[in-house]
Amino acid sequence: AICVHGRTRAQMYQPYADWSIIKAVKDAVKIPVIGNGDVTGAQSACRMIEETGCDMVMVGRAALGNPWVFREINAYLSESCRIMPPPSVPERILVIRRHIELLCGDKGENRGMREARKHVAWYMHGLKGAAEMRKKAGELCTLEDLDCLLKELYTLSNH
């Protein structure tokens, strides 16, 4: 298989990915093609496959703080366009806690928590009070700090 991104490195994140490049590669080769670029969820994954003929899609930035995007895409593509509900706040909290716990287990709490700040901030996108939660995520130093933030997130979500 070959993976093709619809943008050059020099373009970085702008403009939108040019999916016609992916289609041109797919039309030119006989091996599976994986399309990448601006796949943000189930509908964009489906649209990319329809527009380019690619065999699979690759998700990049859309997975940051949203590991559920893979579940969403799989359900949509394999279950007749089934739309998955977004994860509940308790589910998000469990995943955040486990992710950061594993990160700290691998890198030590001090280094792990410094790296965790960006991950926790990504997980907060779209939630009630997200801006304030992201600010607090930038100040996390310990797993205990994370637990306090997650309790606050849970409380906010229930009001």
Which residue stretches match the model-derived regions?
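Short, small-residue-enriched loops and turns at beta-alpha junctions
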Residues: 8-15
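Alpha/beta catalytic cores of nucleotide-metabolism and tRNA/nucleoside-modifying enzymes
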Residues: 1, 13, 20, 24-35, ...
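Short beta-strands and strand-loop turn motifs
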Residues: 3-7
